[in-house]
Curated annotation (Swiss-Prot):
Alphabetical list of Pfam families matching this protein: MIase
This protein's pathway: Aromatic compound metabolism; beta-ketoadipate pathway; 5-oxo-4,5-dihydro-2-furylacetate from catechol: step 3/3
Isomerase keyword on record: yes
Description of how the protein assembles with itself and partners: Homodecamer.
Entry-linked Gene3D superfamilies: Dimeric alpha+beta barrel (3.30.70.1060)
Name listed for the protein in its UniProt record: Muconolactone Delta-isomerase
GO MF, one annotated term: muconolactone delta-isomerase activity
Keywords annotated in UniProt: Aromatic hydrocarbons catabolism, Isomerase
Enzyme kind, highest EC tier: isomerase
Family of this protein: Belongs to the muconolactone Delta-isomerase family.
Keyword Isomerase: yes
Source species, domain of life: Bacteria
Length: 96
C-alpha cells in the first residue's frame, strides 16, 4: 500500500541544540535506511518550510503508523497521511 505523507517538523525553540543535532542525525540515518529498503519510496523537501512530502510503501495502515512512530523526530512532527491507489491513466508500470 502506498501512503502520501506530509511531515512538518516543529522542534521546541528551547530544545538543547546538541539534542536537536542528534535527533536530526538519527532521523537521517533511519530515513536513508528505510529508503534503501524500499519502504520510504520518495522524499521531497517543501521549499521554504521545515517539512517534506513523502511516499511510503508498506503492507498496511498499521505498518505505515508503526513506521512513522519509530522516527526519532515523530514527537515533534505534525503528520498528515493519505492512502494512494494507482490512477488508471498512469503510464508508469511500477505504480502500486
Amino acid at each position: 500500500m502506498l501512503f502520501h505523507v506530509k511531515m512538518t517538523v516543529k522542534l521546541p525553540v528551547d530544545m538543547d541544540p546538541a539534542k536537536a543535532t542528534q535527533l536530526k542525525a538519527d532521523e537521517k540515518e533511519l530515513a536513508q535506511r528505510l529508503q534503501r529498503e524500499g519502504t520510504w519510496r520518495h522524499l521531497w523537501r517543501i521549499a521554504g518550510h521545515y517539512a517534506n512530502y513523502s511516499v511510503f510503501d508498506v503492507s498496511s495502515v498499521e505498518a505505515c503508523n508503526d513506521t512513522l512512530m519509530q522516527l526519532p523526530l515523530f514527537p515533534y512532527m505534525d503528520i498528515e497521511v493519505d492512502g494512494l491507489c494507482r490512477h488508471p491513466s498512469s503510464i508508469h508500470s511500477d505504480d502500486r
